[in-house]
Amino acid sequence: LKENSGKADCAYEEIRKRLETASVVGADETGATVGKHLHWNWIFQNDLLTYVFQSESRGQKAIDSKFPKGLPYSTLVTDRHQSYFRMNVKDHQVCLAHLLRNAEYLNELDPNQNWSRRFIQLIEHSINLRREGNITSRKIKVLKTKMKNLLGESLTHLDNEFEKFKRGILKVKDYLFTFLSNPSVPYDNNASERGVRKIKIKQKVSGCFRTDGGADDFAKLHSIAETAMKNGNSKFNAILAVVQQ
């Protein structure tokens, strides 16, 4: 890895630059052991590009090190990690799959209430509108009004987890239904989650990264290989082209 890492710099930087001008980008992060320390592998990706990097930070410092100007042309699809919402972006879309899982937990926590079930129904209705291609401005307005009313209900009579969840949703309420107005924006962040899962599998097979440099080198070559695959090319041939420079 170390021997060929420098040869990958140009291609790696080109991927990053193309993401800076992309209209839609998904992002996620996952823990990574480097030496004896906890670091974080970050992924920024879309249908054509994958950019992975590692950092000691799980916050804004890590993002700014690679995207100091943010992603001003992009709708950013993520979970609710606050660092993403401090970025300079065109718009946001919160991963609805995450929210559905959170709400299902509330259903199990208190089966006798119906607040979380109504939340799930609204989210699932929005997804069905997209799938059926049955979106109108009026339907979006009605959906947003129903969500606003639901989030305005008092939950103090329920377990504290309900109020905690509602407060979290209120912070991102403007980014629940972006995907209904922009057909290129997905309503989940599954692609980013799959991307970081591949890195987790690598660690389970081969163990931790021994050094910062090794983790960085892997991120470069992994980004190039994944981007090649997304564009219909061979991962092997992409890495071979880097090595043979």
Spans of features found by a protein language model:
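Catalytic center-proximal scaffold of phosphoryl-transfer enzymes
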Residues: L1-Q245
